[in-house]
């Protein structure tokens, strides 16, 4: 049994892979709280730069020399933090263990933060980042000054982390490796449950078992009544629903859903409190927003404050994120990497086309999907569902599969996925490498189109590639 984690401000803390979206958020909170924070990451990122501005020391190399450097001139041995993305063969991790330093998983440090104050931990297969971002933004607007540790950049804060002075901490509880069972929040929120992360969960029952352990650790649970798995398999103290006839404690009955946003009647325990107006399209976003409002109400925020703040909300980074205009096309980036997420994102985009209303600068003529499969295991598990979801686009470009360190599986590739889309009667092509994506986008899209870039790998770099190509050709882009 590992020793319980307890930190004081004198304890140096070192993050291996500090530029990651989850690691950098925790590091940022500690830096803001005047801890001696160091980190390493070979990739430079906006998160790494922000940490430097907060006083953290960030190394670009990951090797034994970094461990020597952080151990030099300190009175206490540094605590070393890693995520599941760091392999045991990482040379810096090997050096840390060789030096006898204590090494903990990021979830242990996050649990220490969550368990130390009133907290809201947002779990679930989809919508965690959006929902936790909305909760933090709404609590901030309501004057409750929350601390936030989010898996995406929150527009209201310009960061994935915020160190507030209020009693509430909002954190995203990632289920991908099962480590969320370490958390004991005051309020556990579960957005939905669906099989994913098949590298860790062999079946849905295994995922449900983990979520039961998590919910059992929560003082109170708020869950989505509209999710059939949650309704059947888990118990909750509070439920939310978009269904008019539901018995859920918190309801938002849709009045209008179009490409420019959502409107719904809001009810608590059957009593109508007013109308919610959300400037984000998609039924999934209305569910996320209702969950956020419900959580904030349980945290003590007034409905009037939440109602007003909701109209100004913006989704977090990489969630239908408008990067800019390129040769008359709108380029939008999204983190969707599961079939349900791809389907929801493309459905939202096509709603803008069909309704003639859009949150974007103009109503798109067509939707061109650029999708990068993420992990061989996930692509193999959901090949048919990915093909079905991508069929919602007018054109499909499949970028090279991002392995995330997994070994190849025979018969699983971007080309195989493109063939599946074609077999269903839709236009699709696979790209051999990332360099060919720019030409493919130019060939398969036209001025007025929406180019929707989806994936959890490096496909988000397409925008910078498009900008570079425009600079080389003397063409205009608008960010």
Swiss-Prot record:
Transmembrane segments: none annotated. ATP binds at residues 124-130. It catalyses: UDP-N-acetyl-alpha-D-muramate + L-alanine + ATP = UDP-N-acetyl-alpha-D-muramoyl-L-alanine + ADP + phosphate + H(+). Pathway: Cell wall biogenesis; peptidoglycan biosynthesis. Keywords: ATP-binding, Cell cycle, Cell division, Cell shape, Cell wall biogenesis/degradation, Cytoplasm, Ligase, Nucleotide-binding, Peptidoglycan synthesis. One of its GO terms (molecular function) is ATP binding. Pfam families: Mur_ligase, Mur_ligase_C, Mur_ligase_M. It is found in: Cytoplasm. Its EC number is 6.3.2.8. GO terms for cellular component: cytoplasm. It comes from the Bacteria. PANTHER family: UDP-N-ACETYLMURAMATE--L-ALANINE LIGASE (PTHR43445:SF3), UDP-N-ACETYLMURAMATE--L-ALANINE LIGASE-RELATED (PTHR43445). Belongs to the MurCDEF family. Cell wall formation. This is UDP-N-acetylmuramate--L-alanine ligase. It comes from Synechococcus sp. (strain RCC307). The lineage of its organism: Bacteria, Bacillati, Cyanobacteriota, Cyanophyceae, Synechococcales.
């Amino acid at each position: 049994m590992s020793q319980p984690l307890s930190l004081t401000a004198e304890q140096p803390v070192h993050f291996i892979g500090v530029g990651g979206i989850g690691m950098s958020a925790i590091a940022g909170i500690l830096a803001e709280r005047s801890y001696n924070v160091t980190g390493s990451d070979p990739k430079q990122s906006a998160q790494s730069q922000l940490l430097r501005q907060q006083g953290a020391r960030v190394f670009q190399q990951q090797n034994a020399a970094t461990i020597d450097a952080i151990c030099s001139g300190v009175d206490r041995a540094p605590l070393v933090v890693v995520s599941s993305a760091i392999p045991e063969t990482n040379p810096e991790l090997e050096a840390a263990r060789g030096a006898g330093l204590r090494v903990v998983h990021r979830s242990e440090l996050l649990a220490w933060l969550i368990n130390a104050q009133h907290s809201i931990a947002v779990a679930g297969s989809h919508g965690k980042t959006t929902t936790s971002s909305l909760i933090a933004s709404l609590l901030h607007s309501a004057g409750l000054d929350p601390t936030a540790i989010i898996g995406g950049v929150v527009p209201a804060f310009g960061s994935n982390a915020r160190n507030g002075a209020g009693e509430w901490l909002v954190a995203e509880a990632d289920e991908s490796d099962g480590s969320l069972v370490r958390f004991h929040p005051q309020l556990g929120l579960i957005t939905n449950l669906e099989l994913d992360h098949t590298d860790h969960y062999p079946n849905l029952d295994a995922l449900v078992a983990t979520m039961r352990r998590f919910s059992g650790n929560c003082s109170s649970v708020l869950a989505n009544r509209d999710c059939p798995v949650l309704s059947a398999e888990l118990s909750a103290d509070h439920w939310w629903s978009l269904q008019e006839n539901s018995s859920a404690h918190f309801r938002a009955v849709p009045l209008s859903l179009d490409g420019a946003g959502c409107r719904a009647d809001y009810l608590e325990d059957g009593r109508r409190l007013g109308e919610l107006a959300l400037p984000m399209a998609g039924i999934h976003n209305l569910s996320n927003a209702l969950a956020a409002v419900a959580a904030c109400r349980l945290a003590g925020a007034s409905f009037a404050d939440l109602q007003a703040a909701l109209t100004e909300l913006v989704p977090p980074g990489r969630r239908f994120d408008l990067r800019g205009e390129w040769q008359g096309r709108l380029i939008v980036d999204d983190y969707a990497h599961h079939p349900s997420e791809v389907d929801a994102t493309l459905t939202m985009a096509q709603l803008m086309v069909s309704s003639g209303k859009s949150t974007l600068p103009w109503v798109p003529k067509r939707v061109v999907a650029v999708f990068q499969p993420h992990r061989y295991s996930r692509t193999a598990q959901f090949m048919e569902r990915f093909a079905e979801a991508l069929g919602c686009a007018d054109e499909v470009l499949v970028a090279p599969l991002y392995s995330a360190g997994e070994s190849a599986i025979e018969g699983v590739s971007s080309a195989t996925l493109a063939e599946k889309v074609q077999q269903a009667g839709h236009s699709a092509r696979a790209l051999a490498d990332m360099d060919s994506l720019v030409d493919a986008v130019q060939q398969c899209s036209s001025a007025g189109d929406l180019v929707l870039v989806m994936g959890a790998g490096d496909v988000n770099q397409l925008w910078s590639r498009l900008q570079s190509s425009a600079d080389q050709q003397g063409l205009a882009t608008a960010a």
